[in-house]
Amino acid sequence: FCSSASVYGVEYSSDPKKEDFLLKPVTRYASNKADAEAFFVEAHKKDKFPITILRPSLTYGPKLGMYRQISTDPSWIDRIRKGKPILICDDGSARCQFLHVDDAAYIFVSLLGKEECFGEVYNVVHKKPYTWKEYHIEAMNVIGKKVELIEVSFKDLSKFKIPRFGLCQDYTSHDAY
């Protein structure tokens, strides 16, 4: 079952989160994933249902494009290309992990049908976490253009009540892996 690292919620600051941590989801998406996990775990315990639960981190690939800390809007790449500054939440020190879809697919396929993995839960994350500031700087390096990163407090971002900033509230303003 494909769950999500978002089931851990935002309270943990442990580096990294472990599979046996208590689930504390804060979004409907994460709550639904946690509920599904509980259903499958119970089915495994009761009836030996053959389930392996995988919790991938922020997964990206050719269809989704590049994440951004404060929204899913891809215009930030264009802003960098044009030399315009971009916003980051707080000081950009919240950590995140990214997982390419090809790596996720490899892991998923490699576990298919492995009886020794039934009833187990695995975090599926990249081995190195990045801060959002490091991530944005790396994107600038790839594009070949440096722009100013404007730090805006989460509190100030929240005042605008812009729906696309919900990602920041629910996930990316916290250590998210």
Q: For the regions a protein language model found, what residue spans apply to each?
A:
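A short C-terminal helix-loop "cap" of Rossmann-like NAD(P)-dependent dehydrogenase/epimerase domains
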Residues: 59, 75-89, 145-150
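Residue-level signal for the nucleotide or nucleotide-sugar donor/cofactor binding architecture
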Residues: 99-102, 130, 174
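Mid/C-terminal beta-alpha module of Rossmann-like enzyme folds, strongest
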Residues: 82, 110-170
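Conserved catalytic-site region of short-chain dehydrogenase/reductase
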Residues: 2-15, 28, 59-63
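The catalytic Tyr-centered alpha-helix of NAD(P)H-dependent dehydrogenases
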Residues: 28-32, 56, 69, 100
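Substrate-positioning beta->alpha
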Residues: 68-76, 82, 89-112, 119-120
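Flexible, glycine-rich beta-alpha linker
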Residues: 52-72
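Active-site Tyr-X1-5-Lys
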Residues: 13, 24-53
